[in-house]
Amino acid sequence: MTPKIVLTPEILSSREGVTNKLKDLYSTQIKLLSSKRDAKIPVVNHYVELLEQYEKQNEELHKLNPLDEGLSQESFIELLDNQLSVKVEELAKINSKLSFEDLSNLNAVYSDSIDRFFWDFHTNRITSTYTLKEYIDPEPLMKVHDARSIVEQSIQTTSQILSLNDYPVPKFEIDSIPLKVKCVAPHLIHIMFELFKNSTLPSISRKKPIIVRVTDEDGFVMFEIADRGGGMPDSSLDKIWQFHYTTSKISERDPIHGFGMGLPLCKVFADFNSGKLSMVNHEHFGVSVFLKIPRAFKD
């Protein structure tokens, strides 16, 4: 039997800290979702449907006293773990409700204020998830990694997911110098998966590899993902960073395409890791995407 965790002043203080942080994040999310209650936009309404869930989780935190020594650490972690289980399903819950008509309607009325709503929601969602995981798992999430290792893990993950979904797997070429990067590794792997996935079919159709370059740029690690798949029409460039913009028809959707969350969500993940994501399109030639993440100079 695992011995019961002894409540020390340090543990009680950390419980108070994480509880207060989560209450602030949930309150911000509740305010954000409440501001869109009267929206006449179906996609936004699907987000607003999560309001009750956030109110419930916020109430759970307000009802407990993290400094109460009668509340065991095991019970406290169980509560946070249950909240995490709900939180990681949010995006899937939203996507399961989206129709092609919903996405078309959103595209017709998309604006800066709608973009800001999505950006703030996903930033808060990712921060909440990170805060919960960081407390539950004693292993730090934000740490130093070898940059090339991140690329290789991303290629392996992409190849596995594409194969499992009956997609062809492209060839990759890595041009990397020894560099270390400080990041949440699953976030960078998610970003690279999305970028590799987008380049897969164009690269295969032209029998060209996806090239990944890793270079040093003024204290940052620059990951360049370049393909020679023909590029995109310049006319589509103003849409690609738009949340829920997709060119896929509802009948073409599969587990890895069709929800329009790839690039914009990657940008949120990059921002969370103090980085930036940008793109250069060469119409009729190919696309280069640049992911810039702070360099780590020591472990």
Task: Show where each model-derived region lies.
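Short beta-strand/loop element within the Bergerat-fold HATPase_c
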Residues: 207-219
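Signal-transmission coiled-coils
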Residues: 2-168
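Glycine-rich ATP-binding loops of the HATPase_c
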Residues: 274-285
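Acidic ATP/Mg2+-coordinating residue in the GHKL
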Residues: 227
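Short conserved segment of the HATPase_c
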Residues: 232-248
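Short helix-loop "hinge" at the ATP-lid/N-box region of the Bergerat-fold HATPase_c
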Residues: 198-203
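Short alpha-helical Gxxx[C/S/T] motif in the catalytic ATP-binding
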Residues: 262, 266
